[in-house]
Curated annotation (Swiss-Prot):
The lineage of its organism: Eukaryota, Metazoa, Chordata, Craniata, Vertebrata. One of its GO terms (biological process) is ATP synthesis coupled electron transport. Its EC number is 7.1.1.2. The chain crosses the membrane at residues 23-43, 59-79, 99-119, 148-168, 174-194, 197-217, 227-247, 260-280, 289-311, 315-337, 355-375, 396-416, 438-458. Belongs to the complex I subunit 4 family. This is NADH-ubiquinone oxidoreductase chain 4. NCBIfam families: NDH_I_M (TIGR01972). It is an enzyme of class 7 (translocase). GO terms for cellular component: mitochondrial membrane. It is found in: Mitochondrion membrane. Its main location: mitochondrion.
Amino acid sequence: MLKLIIPSIMLIPMTFLINKKSLLWTATTFFSFLIAALSTLTLNMDVAEHNSTNPLLSIDQFSCPLIMLSCWLLPLTIMGSQAHMKTEPITRQKTMISLLILLQVLLCITFGASNLLMFYIAFETTLIPTLLIITRWGNQKERLTAGLYFLFYTLSASLPLLLALIMIQTHLNSLSIYIIPLSNLTLLLNTPWSETLWWIACFLAFLIKMPLYIFHLWLPKAHVEAPIAGSMILAAILLKLGGYGMIRMSSLFIPLTKDLAVPFMIIAMWGMIVTSSICLRQTDLKSMIAYSSVSHMGLVVAGIFTMTPWAWSGALAMMIAHGLVSSGLLCLANITYERTHTRSIFMNRGLKTLFPLMSFWWLMMTFANMALPPFPNFMAEILIITSLFNWSNWTILLLGLSMTLTALFSLNMLIMTQHEHPNKHAPVNPSTTREHLLMLMHMAPIILLIANPSAIMI
């Protein structure tokens, strides 16, 4: 862990010591790629299930793939932000890159924390750089409203979680995620309603972060108003903090979760259908991708609450695969927006004739979003759907309708943007090597996961 955290921290002063604009982006991208490559070598969990570097930090089969994803996304966000930031003064460019690096450090600490209080502190601290990125570098004035939604939705559930953790510390004198399961937490409470309140306090912060349908209103606003780097990190990593926290907490509340999670599972599956239907009516590309994320994360919520090994493996695989695919789709939407200056699907028709090479990446990312075989999304959905069907036969109706709607809006997005008659645009610049490399770096891990899916299996 420290092999990743310390070099990442040292990237921040290095960023401020570089004075040339051309060297700034090249150097930070190169060194962040080195850290990402280092993560694939150091975070090898084939030998042991648990590897602790100190009492506060450790990695296991849940945290290892998510830390690797966090490290991999940093150079991609830096590459994706170059065109957006080139007109800014060099001081603001350095500030933006430093915030992205700080966010990676906080995410690595969050996923690697073995103490729940340290996990909570890092989990909440990720809010600060994300909020700064959205409110400072967003395009429209609505970014301030989006920042407020993001802030208050996240903070509203933070205090109950902190109180629940303090209560655990008071009774057990420990917040280690490896010691708490050895004791029965349910014996600490005397009444059923207090057990219910305690369980909700522990899970509400993560359900909002996922976000569960009914708590999702902050996500489309934040996605649409954030710059490309903010959108990529939000979709690829920050939503996964909720899933990771739910997996950690579920292992601590096994008897309670099986009894209390049923309403949230039903809401999650119903939310998949509703958000997929909303995607069919969306005209904004980024908003469509945001609602698509709510739909996919609803499947993860339902899978985690079944409390089966298959579902947890599928949830982890879905979080990794969705992180890469949604980030890739947002990059494609941003590449189009930088040339046509609109996110409307109706204004961005017939892009295949304008950017013939980019249409290949649109095709691949759309198929992955639809969870077609052999993409890892397909494997993840099969594992989760099998577990949910084993939990209740009636879930096949909700899940079948949701999968159909997902395929419909994904194909609608692909056909409308690529195969319709093109609108009359002002002359646009062709796609660049940097943009194709950016998409290749999204696609490469997906191809590797197709070849070796056991890398993200529990």
